[in-house]
Amino acid sequence: EPLWYAKWMQASTTREKYNRGYWLQFYLYKDLENLFIRQGDEAKLRLLNQAYYSGDWSIIAKKGNEGFYFFSDEDVAAIRSSAKTQWGKKIIADLEQKVKERRKHSLEVPKEEGGHFHDYFCPVHNLQFTFRWDKPLAQYCSACDKEWIGNNRYDWAWIYEVHMLNRDYMYQCMYLYLATGKRQYADYIRTMLLDYAGKYAGWFEHNSGRKATDQHSGKAFAQSLDEVNWATKVAMAYMAIKPVLSKEEVKTIEEGYLQPAATLLLHRPAGANWQMWHNSGLAALGIALENDSIVDVAINKDKYGYHYLIGKHKNSDGWINEGSPHYHYYPLEALLFTANAVKCRGIKLFDKDLHDMFVEPVKGT
């Protein structure tokens, strides 16, 4: 007879049993934890932690296409196996070095909204400024050999760079956590996400001129295109560590960042490669929020969803019809992120359309 059940049955009244409900969950958790440890089943241990800390015990029963995740148990097993190979060890070492370098600088999220990448260039030489962590208000051009000071657009673009570097940092930590299981990488993501969650909702919607507008403007960035690119990867990092977050931390991150970001993007209709990236961000946020209605918008919405855009913008020869190789592979990346995100919901987008987009350009047609 399980220990948790014996403890619960010792209560003589319904009220006592109710009051012992917390301990019932605790003993159930410990019994299952011991069982899964004996079985060596890391996948079930992750699900158990997510169920216990979220209070949603139905998670334990979810299998296959019934869950919300970016990496299946098989994916995680493959990542960990690959990380032990000769080439895998090199990748892990590279990621570890990048995370180590990032942690030499401030990890605090900027208090202000970010700007536009196109503003991070010298007005004389059209050369991108050299990013320096300790110079948020002085942007250096190596061709001029001078600092440009007093231009708000340049300084807001510096914040853009910080946000993007933070995205890369959390994405790198995500793969290190999945590959090694080391809790420190989950903690790195947790700390930064909580910081963003505490600031994101308070940022105002703006464009590159710092004007509040719903014409493709963002919050962390000056345009929604950057917003969705950021959300696509950060939502993945969040879901990777969600099983080790407390219920309060999940609530803070979802209400402070994920939900406001989804609300913003649901009201940013665009077209062509922009909307393909919008759908990538919405699909990722929908999975992270476990919200099929958001996923449905990204995939099926008339004039804006994944299927509509494929029909409108994919030529019969496999190319996306925006007139250049760059604007073929750039939106293709978004389509791949979208297809991968929605696999867990039984939505199969790795089909002939995606196949053609890879194969036909290689043929030189």
Annotate the PLM regions.
Residues 2, 45, 185-189, 294-298, ...:
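Solenoid-repeat scaffolds in large eukaryotic assemblies
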Residues 12, 18-270, 276-283, 303, ...:
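Extracellular glycan-targeting catalytic surfaces
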Residues 13-14, 85, 234, 289-291, ...:
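Intrinsic-disorder/low-complexity, polar/charged segments
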Residues 252-365:
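Extracellular polysaccharide-recognition and catalytic grooves
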Residues 1, 7-10:
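A short beta-strand element within beta-rich, extracytoplasmic domains
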Residues 14, 181, 246, 290-291, ...:
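Residue-level recognition of short, structured coil/turn motifs
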